[in-house]
Amino acid sequence: MDFIRKQVDVLKKPFTKGGKLEKLYPAFNAFETMLFVPDHTTSKGSHIRDGVDLKRTMITVIIALVPALFYGMYNTGYQYYIQTNIEFTFFDAVLHGAYKIFPMIAVSYAVGLAIEFAFAVYRNHPVNEGYLVTGLLIPMIMPIDMPLWMLAISVIFAVLIAKEAFGGTGMNILNPALTARAFAFFAYPTFMTGDKVWVSEATNIDGISGETILGTLAANGEVAYSSASMFMGSIPGSVAETSVFFVLIGALLLIITGVGSWRIMLSGVIGASVVGILFNLWGANSLMSFEWYNHLLVGGFAFGIVFMATDPVSAAQTTKGKWIYGFLVGVFCILIRVFNPAYPEGVMLAILLMNVFAPLIDHYVIESNVSMRRKRWQGAKLETT
């Protein structure tokens, strides 16, 4: 490591103040920070000695995403091969999935990081590690055969509008990854819905049936998958959203490390379950009659409530606010699924909606606490007098 440190120090000289490449220092600083812990410290304000910085927090989330990502690779190949009736092995499925998914990840990182670097140089501030997670999340929540140019445009929109327009990492109101998906959904709806977008190379296969479970229910069809299949994720869907089992592995890591809020996750499940049970009692259509516990297993609910709703920037910040925020995400997710037949998956819109209301929730939670303390103080003052 000492050898690498010395080489980096040699490369650093042209980028320091007064050097020929001074304006590109933020880009070099990002490279240096990726290799070593930053050597700068705060000069004023509160000082907290902690071994966890933004980079390590982002890496923790990426590690939590890996199980769902690798299963997504397998499921991509699995869904393709079972439609073609070609004999295949586990490794055949994984290789096909990797062949389809890795270019999407590469495009997402290349385009997104290029914009991040450009803004860092323009604003003369360090490149933050926030996009490390966003750049992986975006391709994981997209259909497998989404054209790469379309993915690139969605990334550009998300980074510019949902992130940089608000000031960059830590300042965004909306979740950037979900903003990218929302843009793609409304700008290119034919590539985001239907029975041809969820299975790799579906347009080249005659008679394919790749409709998602929620899409089938929205059309009053019968579901051909068991709850076990839904839980494990061997069903059509977005790249890495289908397996609840592997999402829960990531959720466990986020909870243990304290990176993800278990309050938001649990309250989201409670909210969705309550509304799902009420609709089961009503049972007016296929989506209402769909078992409440299966609502938790299909679509992007598990992935969204674990990795999207818990975004520490766009989610509620107060303890009570997290319970309210998560509960309402679950409630609106099921409501949108049931009452919006044109878009049976509701978790994306539910989370984005609650992102907008998260500051308001925190505001009233804080105001409520201040009011309670004021009344308590006034009561204590009266007793002493």
What label would you give each PLM region?
Residues 1-105, 384-385:
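N-terminal signal-anchor module of multipass membrane proteins
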Residues 42-48, 112-123, 160-170, 249-257, ...:
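C-terminal ends of transmembrane helices
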Residues 94-110, 145-154, 230-244, 289-301:
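Structural signature of hydrophobic alpha-helical transmembrane segments
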Residues 111-116, 131-140, 155-162, 246-254, ...:
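Hydrophobic, membrane-inserted alpha-helices
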Residues 152, 173-178, 292-299, 322, ...:
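Loop-to-transmembrane alpha-helix initiation sites
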Residues 170-248:
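Long hydrophobic alpha-helical segments that form multi-pass transmembrane helix bundles
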Residues 265-270, 274-319:
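A beta-strand-loop signature enriched in Asp, Gly, Thr, and Trp
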